[in-house]
């Protein structure tokens, strides 16, 4: 009898550790040391390990591609109805940034989509977080209708200042990328606690380093010892990394510049969006980029 009690206690403890990302203002997900279907990759930022020519960035392991990359570079999403029109507009603006320079497409989910991104502010986690890559565990992320949702929490406070950049950062996590400042060749001025999961270094044996360190990446935190930057646009290496990870070279990609800061979205009221359609994006100044 006691053996059964101990067994189920350990099982419950293990489940709570697997399904609950570590706390932080951006996200949490550790890379599992062993291949496990039930254990989602977790951490604040990084990408997948890719056997290709030298690129910049850091990514997840090749064995995770099949289950954690989004097929055909297409991410179905569902944005909770509790967000205001302005908040929803900021989220959609961040999604549109990927369309400009990569083959990745975010679209409203359909009833036939088995996997999709769910954005909600009520998850029992800190402010803003995202899982790394598409989640596939029905045990942890299954819904009542048999679907599997990859969760992103966006508290409204995350959207107040540099909201567009914050959402772009979190969407990079959703695509499979980790933090740039957690590389072993990062700026030596970066300081912090080694016990903090968003400061620790990811070993090259457990993650894929896509070329050299890039302090301008949208996946890089701002630190007091390093010149502060407001990031609401992709660096050239961010663009290369996404296109490499999702094999965009053989697809048509827009040539709009992404290294120029976009128009602020924090003071502009967005219209109510029923569908994420290109014609709506092009007709609304909230989503326009400066192209000169």
UniProtKB/Swiss-Prot annotation:
Principal location class: secreted
Keyword Thylakoid: no
E.C. number: 3.4.24.-
Cofactor note text: Binds 1 zinc ion per subunit.
UniProt keyword DNA-binding, yes or no: no
Subcellular location: Secreted
InterPro entries, A to Z: MetalloPept_cat_dom_sf, Peptidase_M12A, Peptidase_Metallo
GO terms for biological process, alphabetical: proteolysis
Active site: 170
Cystine residue pairs: 103-248, 128-158
Annotated keywords: Disulfide bond, Hydrolase, Metal-binding, Metalloprotease, Protease, Secreted, Signal, Zinc, Zymogen
Binding site for Zn(2+): 169, 173, 179
Enzyme class: hydrolase
Cofactor(s) named in the record: Zn(2+)
Gene Ontology cellular-component annotations: extracellular region
Signal peptide: 1-16
Residues annotated as domain Peptidase M12A: 56-249
GO terms for MF: metalloendopeptidase activity; zinc ion binding
Family annotation (SUPFAM superfamilies): Metalloproteases ('zincins'), catalytic domain (SSF55486)
Task of the protein: Metalloprotease.
UniProt-recorded name of the protein: Zinc metalloproteinase nas-3
Phylogenetic lineage: Eukaryota, Metazoa, Ecdysozoa, Nematoda, Chromadorea
Gene: nas-3
């Amino acid at each position: 009898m006691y053996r059964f009690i101990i067994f189920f206690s350990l099982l419950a403890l293990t489940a709570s550790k697997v399904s609950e990302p570590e706390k932080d203002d951006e996200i949490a997900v550790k890379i599992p040391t062993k291949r496990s279907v039930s254990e989602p990759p977790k951490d604040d930022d990084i990408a997948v390990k890719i056997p290709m020519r030298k690129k910049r960035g850091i990514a997840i392991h090749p064995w995770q591609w099949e289950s954690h990359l989004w097929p055909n570079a297409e991410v179905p999403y569902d944005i909770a109805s509790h967000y205001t029109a302005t908040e929803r507009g900021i989220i959609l603006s961040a999604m549109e940034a990927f369309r400009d320079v990569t083959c990745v497409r975010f679209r409203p989910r359909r009833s036939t989509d088995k996997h999709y991104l769910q954005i909600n502010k009520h998850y029992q986690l800190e402010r803003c977080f995202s899982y790394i890559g598409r989640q596939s565990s029905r045990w942890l992320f299954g819904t009542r209708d048999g679907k599997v949702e990859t969760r992103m929490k966006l508290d409204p406070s995350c959207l107040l200042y540099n909201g567009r950049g914050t959402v772009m950062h979190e969407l990079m996590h959703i695509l499979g990328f980790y933090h740039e400042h957690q590389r072993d060749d990062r700026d030596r001025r970066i300081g912090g606690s080694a016990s903090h999961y968003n400061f620790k270094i990811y070993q090259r044996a457990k993650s894929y380093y896509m070329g050299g360190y890039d302090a301008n990446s949208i996946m890089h935190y701002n630190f007091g010892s390093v010149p502060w930057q407001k990031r609401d646009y992709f660096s050239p290496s961010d663009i290369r990394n996404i296109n490499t990870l999702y094999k965009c070279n053989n697809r048509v990609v827009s040539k709009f510049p992404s290294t120029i800061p976009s128009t602020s979205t924090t003071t502009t009221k967005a219209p109510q969006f029923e569908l994420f359609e290109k014609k709506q994006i092009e007709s609304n100044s909230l989503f326009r980029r400066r192209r000169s």
